[in-house]
């Protein structure tokens, strides 16, 4: 395996984690693929040794179609998560391999970041982590589940060098 000097941590982790990244969005100001990789891996690394995730950036029209078809909501949302084992309750074990798809709509993310006074990078990081946590079985429908998921999001964002994602700030 060829090693990269610029991002050596990616070479080591690629043996365990594969991110199939596709940018099918026309939006400007999207972080680099390596950033999405780093954010996704930060959420996975303590609970999964192996993972295969597709992360696709789609424009609003396509994101809206997925949200309508799979959630019955006729609008573009920031992130959608599709776990291979969705609907099954599986304990997170280090030996499992996680499979799933994430769809992120950059136009929605950029709009929300501006409205919430967050940098785009911070909001993309948060929603990538948020989506991966959904793939891992976290949810926020019930209040007690939301507390657990939000606490994990805050922990991971702080570890990645970002502030609490649930606090607004000016940039």
UniProtKB/Swiss-Prot annotation:
GO terms for molecular function: metalloendopeptidase activity; RNA endonuclease activity; zinc ion binding. Its main location: cytoplasm. One of its GO terms (biological process) is rRNA processing. Zn(2+) binds at residues 130, 134, 140. Coiled coil: none annotated. Keywords: Cytoplasm, Endonuclease, Hydrolase, Metal-binding, Nuclease, Ribosome biogenesis, rRNA processing, Zinc. Its cofactor is Zn(2+). GO terms for cellular component: cytoplasm. It is an enzyme of class 3 (hydrolase). It is found in: Cytoplasm. The keyword Manganese does not apply. InterPro entries: MetalPrtase_cat_dom_sf_prd (IPR023091), YbeY (IPR002036), YbeY_CS (IPR020549). Gene3D superfamilies: Metalloproteases ('zincins'), catalytic domain. Binds 1 zinc ion. Its EC number is 3.1.-.-. Single strand-specific metallo-endoribonuclease involved in late-stage 70S ribosome quality control and in maturation of the 3' terminus of the 16S rRNA. PANTHER family: ENDORIBONUCLEASE YBEY, CHLOROPLASTIC. Belongs to the endoribonuclease YbeY family. This is Endoribonuclease YbeY. The lineage of its organism: Bacteria, Pseudomonadati, Pseudomonadota, Betaproteobacteria, Neisseriales.
């Amino acid at each position: 395996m060829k090693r990269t000097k610029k991002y050596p941590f990616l070479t080591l982790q690629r043996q365990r984690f594969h991110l199939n990244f596709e940018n099918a969005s026309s939006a400007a100001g999207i972080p680099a693929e390596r950033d999405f990789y780093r954010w996704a891996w930060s959420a996975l690394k303590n609970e999964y040794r192996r993972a295969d995730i597709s992360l696709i950036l789609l424009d609003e029209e396509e994101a809206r179609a997925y949200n309508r078809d799979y959630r019955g909501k006729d609008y573009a949302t920031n992130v959608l998560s599709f776990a291979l084992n969705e609907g099954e309750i599986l304990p997170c074990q280090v030996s499992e391999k996680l499979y799933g798809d994430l769809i992120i709509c950059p136009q929605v993310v950029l709009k929300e970041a501006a409205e919430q006074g967050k940098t785009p990078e911070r909001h993309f990081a948060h929603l990538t982590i948020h989506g991966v946590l959904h793939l891992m079985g976290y949810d926020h429908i019930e209040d007690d589940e939301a507390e657990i998921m939000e606490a994990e999001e805050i922990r991971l964002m702080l570890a990645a060098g970002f502030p609490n994602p649930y606090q607004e700030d000016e940039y």
